[in-house]
Amino acid sequence: MGNQQSSGIEGSKPISAFYYNNISTVISRDGFYFFNNQSQRFESSKRPITFVIYDEEGNQFITGEDDFFIRLYNEDGTYIKQLPNLQSNITTDVIAISHQDFIRVLFPIRNIDFHQINSNSNNSNTMLLSGGMDGTIRLWQVETGSLLAVYNQDISKVTMNGIIDTTSAGITALTFDPTNLLVISGTSDGIVRKHSLRERVIMGTFIGHSRGAILNLLLTKHGHLLSSSMDRTIRLWDIDSGKQITGCKYFSQTMVYDHHRDIVFAASDTGTIAVIQIVKDLNNSWSLKKIKVLDLKKPAILHLHYNTYVDQLTVTSIETNIASVQNATGIPFESVENDYKKQVNLVQGLWETTNNRLTITPSQSNNSLAKSQSINNQLNQSTTSTINQQQQQQQQQQQQQQQQQQQQQQYEDEFEDEYIDNQIKEKQQQLLQQQQQQQQQQQNEEEPIEDYIFSNEISSELTEEFIQLSIEELKNIKLTNMIENTLNSDQMILIDRLKQLEFLGNELFEHQSSQEEKEYNEARKLKYVNGLTQFQDSIEEMSEDYVSCMRMLIKTNDADIVLDTDNCKDIKIRSLEQKRMEILERHRLELEQFQGEVDRELSVFSDQQLPLITKKVANECFENKKRLLNSQESIEKSIQTYLSNTFPAVNQRYHLGPLISENSTTVFRAFDCKSLIPVAVKVLPPVALNIPVHENLTKVYQVCQTPQSIYVIMEPSTTSLKPLVESMDQHQLPISMVISIMKQLLQCLLFLHSSSLVYRDLNPSRVLLTTTTTTANDDVDCELQQQQQQQVKVKLTHFGIMRSLQGNVDSEPAEDGMIYGSPEIFGRVINTESDIWSLGVIFIYLLQTKQERTKPLFHGHNNKSVIESIVKIVGRPFQKDIDRMIANGNMTSDAIQLLQYAASLPVPFEDSIDNLRSHCSLASDSALDLLTQMLQFVPHKRISIEQALSHPFILNLPKQQQQQQQQKQQQQQQQQQQQEIIPKDDSLTDISSNKQETVVYDANIQINQEDLISKIKENEIQKEIDFKENQINEEIKEDVKEEIEEDIKEEIKEEIKEESKEVQEEAKEEIKEEIQIETQEVKEEIKEEVQVEIKEEKIKEEIKEEIKEETQEEIKEENKDEIQETIKEEVQVEIKEEIKEETQEEIKEILNEVQVKEEVKEEIQEEVSQETLSEIQEEVKEEIQEDIKEEVKEEIQNEIREEIQNEIREEIKEEIKKVSEEIQNEIQEEVKEEIQNEIQEEQQDTIKEEIQEIKQEIISERDTNQEGEISDTIVSDSKEADSIIEGPVTLERDNKNASDHDDEQQFVEEEIEVEEEIEVEEEIEVEEEIEVEEEIEVEEEIEVEEEIQVEDDTDKSNDF
């Protein structure tokens, strides 16, 4: 890796660094820093630098700066000129000539005929290509500073000078092909294009890189194009055809190519530099071989500069450190100068030693040198195409020396020629063999270049849980190949947010009211949209980077090992085994070396290596996600900053636009950047707010308070009353809509008043509306069908005016709206009745026609004139009412005088209803009635909110009901008035106190008195009428109620019957299914038990047969044992009889159980027919499940089995003991008898034959009987009984063996007696067998009858 040195600079971070002539130059945003061994110097730039290159041939720096201009500086940092070279006054032509965005790449061109490009150019031989993020490539003439051409894929727009200037994807990489005169560019959309230098058109594209910006473009000395991209690949292209030759996977953020050594230095974002060689094999195929990787232990690398003469790399990292890597390749420049040495190096490899290289001394002749050079050219055709001036001078000097020595050494030359020819031929063969061996080793042994560079350290934040989640996620990605689905959901949310922000921002720009600033607003709008587009591009690039990283991570060997360990291991083992066989076939001696390789390669699957690799892969997944989240956070902050710079922000969330309407002064349009919805912002001075929540109040999202003001964030409105009225035909609202609006307003005011709040400034501009349209029905007339009925949703706003009933009115802001204010407002008194007055004025506004609205209802130039207009329309108040108003409110002296003035005004000639009808001619009687009750001068005489909601007009009742409702309300009001007006003495004293007034005033008072008296009488009469009407209505209601109740009861009964039928049917079906299932289960259980018992009986029979066979064999062997066999058979017969009796008892018990079950079923069926269906569903299920399954199956069976088994065991044991004793005694007696009765042997033979015949008959009869018994009866388990039976068998065998040793004399004496007993027993057995058969037949008949009954019962239950 060489010696690595690091240094740093103060101030801004560096952009790039260069090393030449023993001077290190570091370029930052501010300028140039020059370092050597003794001093340090700084030269500032004209503007902040965004990109810089060093032109070695021109010894100058070329920069792209923040003002989109290109500037040239000398190698010492002194300023030269700028491109374009224009005067200080900036015009629109400057914008057309210069770049429109930041310059990202610069590339100088020399030794090109400018007349091939532009006929107007001079004879200068220096040009410059520049590419910017505006998507254009511009060709400059350096000496004059003029623009020659612009290259772009879009030719739809042309400037006045014929220069193409449009925007597209940003240019991120540039290079120039001098042979074909092609400008090759890479853009941010991942496409590489080649442009004709002369025609300025696109000649083709290089397709292969996936989506992502092209980072680097280089031209090799072999005429190929080398590119790197954000897709983490490096590719080699054929420029003519545009096809990809080869490539490797490595992320190269910046890249440098050395023509002399044919080596590429690729620096990544992880602080590593890959040294890659471009190699051509014998088959003329090209490949990129990674020689080594230099790990600088630094962060991301921004820039590389390679000095080919000293073999030194200057590295600029993202931090302020500048690293210097000496002996980067280990190949000195002197070896590169010499062609012969260079060829040997290329053959043997850059990493091999140079001890065996051939060298030619200066004394060798010119001919030998020519021959050696020709042979070397045959070995490798790729020679250097350019040689600097120093190399040419050295060659000329060598040629002169060789010519001088040529004459002196002709003889030596001939000898040396032959020697050199032979030596070179041998060396040629050796080199060819070495190349072939190296190729084979590289194909078999060389590891592939990893396309993914893993991190050097494992993150401490990596947990076991995240490791498992990461591996599972990578497995899903590998299986589905859908890496895009793994992106964070916030990614798509960001893109959707940008789209919505664009829409909301454009909407704000469109609502700008000033026409003079349209051009300025359009420019702001364009800049706003372009900024959001750049954010979207950044998000796409970020997601593509993440996708490419994850894809490359999945394709790595380590990921394959972790994700598919078994399969990968199997593949690896198979490949290794295949190599093993090949190596064995080639050479047996290589087996040991290969075994070591096998162990090494399989070690990655060991318990030690596999967890480390797993952590490494999971760590990369974790780091990728972490980078993604950090990028998202940074973009989110940038978006927030961008929005704040574009629109004023409240609480860094709500961005303000223009005023929401022309009449509004403190309400602005805005949008919420978090929830992405439009909002309205109300600006208020710092006052206390009490914001209630109701469906008819504008929804408040948030209240933001500052020391200077309060910002109320609320939902925006669509329209108000005035635009709604103007949108109607003839500016007239339908009555249904008026009722809907009034009802909603009353409900909203009722809520506010119940919360001790008064709206205070209710007027049409405060009533916001949202409308929805519904088409009329087909049954309506044709004219009405064409109209649309609008449904209105009312929203009250303006919370700054709303105040608490306990608040101080002077502390709150006052606004215009006195036309809609009540009379007490002039006295600065606020109560709930004030809102009723304002709502009445709005009610008139809704009912008026277009002409009537031109004249305001209450008008005047001052407070007195307004009071006069109020008195003219609603009537003059009484003095006592004024006194009451003054006493109830804390009024100023001016307000008191104003109210006294209202009481002193003359009484209007016309009635208030007539006055109101003149201002709203289309109002109905019920509407006018509601208006008169709302527009009462005295607050406590106005109608309440509850009464207004129950008014006939609001309820939209028919006329008769309206009249009745009006009469009731009038009675209630008259009762209240009587309590206030009577006693008459008070009114008379009030009248007498004013005798000094004019005659007209006294007459008015007398008229008012007469009116009051007449009204009182009318009220009394009306009360009686209403009382009678109420009685009649109550009687009618009672009758109607009774009829309705009867009808409802009948309907309910019918519905209940129908429902009960349905429930019954469902219950029946369920019961049937359950009974069928249970019967099937019982049958299956019985069958299983029968099968088990049959098997057990078969086993018993087999045991019996075995016993018989054993006894027969013993009889054949010894005649003495014949009598014993008969005795054993008798014992067995007795045991069988006992077993039969027990089994019969068991059968009877089981039959009784079955009968019990059937009885239970019958009882259940009877109960089903009697009980209700709802109880049947529960009881039947419980009884069937508990009684049948648990009690019958478990308890009965278990008890019976245990009792039978215990009884059998005890009885068999006792009988076996008795039998064994008897047998022993009998055997002794028989032996004695045998001795005595030897003479009777002939008789015994005959007896034996008869016994055998009888045995066979008995056995045959038993077999037949047992088969019938097994098929028709149910017996208990006999597994334990079998084990018990084995006991007496063993005892009998023991007894038999003991009896063999007894005397044979007893056997003879008792033989006759035994024969007699056998005959008697046989007769008894025959009789018993007959009885058993008869009993079995009877039981079979009973079972058949019972089965028939069960089937009949099931059929009946199914029918039920």
From Swiss-Prot:
MF terms in GO: ATP binding; protein serine/threonine kinase activity
Residue spans of biased composition, Basic and acidic residues class: 1291-1300
Region (Disordered): 959-989, 1258-1311, 1331-1360
InterPro entries per the UniProt record, alphabetical: Kinase-like_dom_sf (IPR011009), Prot_kinase_dom (IPR000719), WD40/YVTN_repeat-like_dom_sf (IPR015943), WD40_repeat_CS (IPR019775), WD40_repeat_dom_sf (IPR036322), WD40_rpt (IPR001680)
Comp. bias regions, Low complexity: 959-979
Repeat (WD) residue spans along the chain: 44-83, 109-152, 166-205, 208-247
Pfam families per record: Pkinase, WD40
Positions in coiled-coil regions: 1014-1269, 1297-1352
Domain of life: Eukaryota
Record-annotated Protein kinase domain positions: 636-954
Biased composition range(s): Acidic residues: 1301-1311, 1331-1354
UniProt keyword list: Coiled coil, Repeat, WD repeat
Family membership: Belongs to the protein kinase superfamily. CMGC Ser/Thr protein kinase family.
Free-text comment on this protein's domains from its UniProt entry: The protein kinase domain is predicted to be catalytically inactive.
Protein name per its UniProtKB record: Probable inactive protein kinase DDB_G0270444
Organism: Dictyostelium discoideum (Social amoeba)
